[in-house]
Amino acid sequence: MAGGNSFLARTGRAFKDFFSPIDLTKGTVWKVILKFTVPIIVSYILQQLYILSDAAICGQNLSADEVAGVNDTSPLVFIFMQFAFGCTAGFCVIMSNKIGAGDKNGMRRSFATQIVLCLAITVLLTAIAMSCISLMLAWVNVTPQNPQVYRAAYTYCFVIYAGIAAQLFFNFATSILRSIGDSFTPLLFLLISTVMNIWLDILFIKGFRWGVAGAAGATVLTQALCTVACFGYIFIKYKDLRPGKADFKIGTRDIAAHLKQGLPLGLQFSVLSIGLIVMLAETVKFDIMPGGAFVAGNPAQNGMGAANKLINFMMCPMSALGTAIVSYNAQNLGAGDTERVKRGTNQSLVIMLFLYVLFAGFGLLLTIGGAYQRIFLSADKISSESLRYGNAFLYVDLPLFIILGTLFVLRNGVQGIGKSIWTLAAGGGELIARVVICAFLPSLINGGAVNATASHAAFVALCFGDPGAWLFAVLILLYPYRKHILKKDYSYLFKK
């Protein structure tokens, strides 16, 4: 009996430890990073399942035009959601610095400042997004000329944009938890949200037959409910974070410090979205005949859309590693341990190599027999042409994932030491490279304007927009990585 009680006690302590924040300033560097990263990896994979459940259920239950419409909204949703995500991730660098320095008053003031800024950003983004839907759809060549695709895309954007608040504050809450070293609780909430979203998708799309609106509504409702639960957990579990009335007496210095970290990262992600919009607009051209009619089934859009979803899934582990290194570097810089910042960033690059081999290889395996398209599209939407377009994209992107992994580590490592202006510069570099490659290289290879009759080589040229953009950004980030992280030059911290 005593042995049984001992086992239960150990199990209880182990379960409790999962919910305890990790001190990123102590312990063996690579072990601490891995321990902190693994729940984030699982969280990001769940987040993709959360997104992919929409795609799979839509792909199996909606028409080809409706699926194409939903796929075409990806960069348009991305441009606002990623701005919000970038801002909240950047704001939390301040929180991590305060935690590393042991400044509890600073933690609460940072939390209060972030709440106010997130409310302001929500109002601004919702107003802009809701008023610009038709304009942005025109950017990606989705117009009333193809009414079924246009109607589906407009409806999806409208519902998602109306729920920006839920998505922004859910990202904010999970970023707060990770900034204090708790990467397990966001995983738990994402698990709950994934299951809930799949159930609501089935209910709204198959049960109520709400179509595209049902898919978007399920996502928004799920995130709203999980946001409330997540903030409730934060206020109950972490009493030191509860801001009081005095903490909301925010000065311009507090706002400026957070905006200095958040805005460049938010703008960087939005800038990336503009590049993706250009890439999508060029992809749509491969579905348009010389006379202006659309190819039946939209194979380029659906093939590329399915491939993009697989790419997003396979990049999750490397993206999660980048997310982890932000909090790791920020906490250790706050504690004044610059050598630990250097070792952590370098060891993260080694970890990234293992993740690259594993997940890029697995992604390539899923191209055999078009397996990935069978996940995201029903059989009637899969054709030799959709496979040709989708596989071409994957054969270019996946082998070059090592560049993307390097970008994730360097960009987030530099963000974690407070040099957010360099992350914005890298985003600008990505935009320039992607726009130049996507807008000019396909036409150059094709020997003229691109349309559904263009050569396969022209589409392959378009696919190089991704790795070309990643490489350009990495080249920019090598400077702050070498100057500040490797050479440990942190003199900028002491400048007034």
Spell out what each predicted region is.
Residues 67-127, 167-186, 301-364, 404-426:
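Small-residue-rich hydrophobic transmembrane alpha-helices
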Residues 41, 45, 49, 53, ...:
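Generic alpha-helical transmembrane segments of integral inner-membrane proteins
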Residues 26, 30-49, 53, 76-83, ...:
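Residue-level signal for short hydrophobic patches within transmembrane helices
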Residues 85-88, 159-178, 186-194, 215-230, ...:
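Short runs within selected transmembrane alpha-helices of multi-pass transporters and secretion channels
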Residues 49-68, 137-147, 203-210, 270-307, ...:
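Helix-terminus/linker motif at the lipid-water interface of multi-pass membrane proteins
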Residues 64-75, 153, 157, 216, ...:
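Small-residue hotspots at the loop-to-helix junctions and early N-terminal turns
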Residues 1-37, 95-163, 209-263, 329-400, ...:
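Short alpha-helical transmembrane segments in multi-pass integral membrane proteins
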Residues 35-54, 159, 193, 222-226, ...:
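Transmembrane helical elements of multi-pass membrane transporters/channels
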